[in-house]
């Protein structure tokens, strides 16, 4: 007796189709699982056996073999419990074999209740691409999986409910897609921030062009507060960005029935004690790290010099390529990691260097040693560096309302729309000025004669690298877009240069 049931698996953040074959034959009773199963898959034997018996079926006292194809890919996790049960029951003749347009995923309890699994959305998308029309998943995963187009997703609470549906005795209603508007609510507002207009301006430029930014200032000046409000002025995520981001968070086990879709740009703020593997991703079965969880969003590193140097160096390649590769003996996995890097730091170890109160007792060598923890190549990849002054009492008590995130976002959205139209006309794939490919840089960043002269003088005086020069051009292009200027003028160049004048050698 033979049965074939379709299921799915996940490698990295991508799903793939799995064919589960169940074969019951004469011989000594036994239950073997083949096809590179890990320990969790092998343990499914006991869960499936108990679930079958506890739901009124007789477990076959025969020789049973379950094959998970393709056999050259390692199968991990508990998601094969449900398809294994369906395969055994159909091979034993207790239920009719499901059609080729059905797929099953889910972990079983001993009583036959379904428990959620990770990676529901990437598996649902893989099912849709494989031509599967109906996907049966645990009820807690249904809203997430229903975000995939062209697929009927059925929420299953337990084995009895599923068997009744397959026998057409009591049908399960397909899950509706999640409410995206509700998912995106609840981001803090810039209206809460008093003063610090120069920092708000720098963050507006960073948001408009997708630029990396470093905020330097004393404790309590509002660095973290403003950084956490940055997502509120970033452009809304497209559907494709939501899918990409949710896939990563789903594989990491960070989605939930209450919040199945990542509809607002993520903000990840790892502690400075994070390891290199925690930042980049890793594990025996590779899982995404903080830089991938920040994909399409913001990676906020507070107290930047306190991070270990080997951890900070992990950032260099993802900042250039927008992806990170994790290599293991079992294979290589690539995770997307296109994020905005937002960093904050004190001007010195004590936090009060240069403060008007005179509380700092650091020597010049102490300050230089503190700054030297950040490597030149990493600083070269930061587009804007802005100083946050200590907040004056009059500013703190000012009753005039501060500009809201919604008002700032309107200008950011307008600048991004200019960029999208420009890249579409030029045949480029970039989404914002920070990602302008080198081949398009000179064409896109047309500088006026006065601006070119200023840039030349700054290049010589500041001893800029080629990368720094390119990044100043990109920032100037964003400033010009915010001003709705076709060409980059000298004032745009001057403001862009201003954000690279913080001296890490003399401070």
Where are these regions (language model features)?
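Short beta-strand elements
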Residues: 18-24, 279, 383-386
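Basic, amphipathic alpha-helical bundle interface domains used for macromolecular binding and assembly
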Residues: 40-45, 60, 67-77, 285-286, ...
């Amino acid at each position: 007796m033979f049965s074939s049931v379709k299921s799915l698996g996940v490698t990295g953040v991508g799903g793939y189709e799995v064919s589960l074959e169940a074969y019951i034959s004469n011989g000594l009773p036994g239950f073997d699982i083949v096809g590179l199963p890990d320990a969790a898959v092998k343990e499914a034997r006991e869960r499936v056996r108990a679930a079958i018996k506890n739901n009124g079926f007789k477990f076959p006292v025969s020789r049973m073999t379950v094959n998970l194809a393709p056999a050259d890919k390692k199968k991990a996790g508990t998601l094969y419990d449900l398809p294994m049960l369906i395969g055994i029951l159909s091979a034993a003749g207790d239920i009719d074999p499901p059609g080729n347009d059905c797929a099953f995923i889910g972990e079983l309890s001993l009583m036959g209740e379904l428990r959620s699994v990770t990676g529901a959305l990437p598996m649902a998308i893989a099912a849709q691409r494989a031509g599967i029309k109906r996907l049966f998943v645990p009820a807690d995963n249904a809203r997430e999986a229903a975000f995939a187009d062209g697929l009927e997703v059925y929420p299953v609470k337990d084995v009895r409910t599923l068997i009744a549906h397959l026998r057409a005795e009591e049908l399960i209603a397909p899950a509706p897609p999640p409410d995206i508007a509700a998912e995106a609510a609840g981001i803090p507002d810039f209206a809460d921030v008093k003063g610090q207009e120069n920092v708000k301006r720098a963050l507006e430029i960073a948001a408009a062009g997708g630029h990396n930014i470093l905020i330097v200032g004393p404790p309590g000046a509002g660095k973290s507060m403003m950084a956490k409000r940055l997502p509120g002025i970033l452009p809304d995520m497209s559907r494709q960005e939501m899918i990409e981001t949710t896939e990563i968070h789903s594989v990491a086990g960070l989605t939930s029935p209450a919040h199945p879709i990542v509809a607002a740009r993520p903000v990840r703020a790892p502690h400075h004690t994070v390891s290199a593997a925690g930042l980049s991703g890793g594990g025996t079965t590779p899982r995404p790290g903080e830089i991938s969880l920040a994909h399409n969003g913001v990676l906020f590193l507070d107290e930047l010099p306190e991070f270990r140097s080997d951890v900070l160096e992990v950032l260099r390649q993802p900042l250039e390529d927008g992806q990170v590769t994790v290599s293991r003996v079992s294979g290589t996995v690539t995770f997307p990691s296109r994020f905005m890097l937002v960093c904050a730091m004190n001007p010195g170890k004590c936090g009060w260097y240069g403060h008007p109160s005179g509380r700092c007792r650091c020597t010049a060598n102490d300050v230089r040693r503190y700054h030297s923890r950040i490597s030149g190549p990493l600083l070269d990849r930061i587009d804007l560096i802005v100083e946050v002054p200590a907040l004056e009492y009059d500013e703190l008590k000012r009753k005039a309302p501060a500009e809201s995130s919604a008002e700032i976002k309107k200008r950011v959205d307008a600048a991004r729309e200019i960029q999208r139209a420009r890249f579409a006309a030029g045949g480029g794939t970039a989404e914002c000025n920070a990602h302008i490919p080198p081949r398009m840089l000179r064409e896109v960043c047309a500088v006026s004669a006065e601006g070119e002269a200023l840039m030349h003088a700054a290049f010589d005086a500041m001893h800029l690298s080629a990368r720094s020069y390119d990044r100043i051009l990109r920032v100037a292009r964003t400033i010009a877009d915010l001003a709705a200027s076709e060409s980059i003028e000298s004032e745009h160049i001057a403001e862009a240069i201003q954000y690279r004048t913080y001296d890490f050698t003399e401070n």
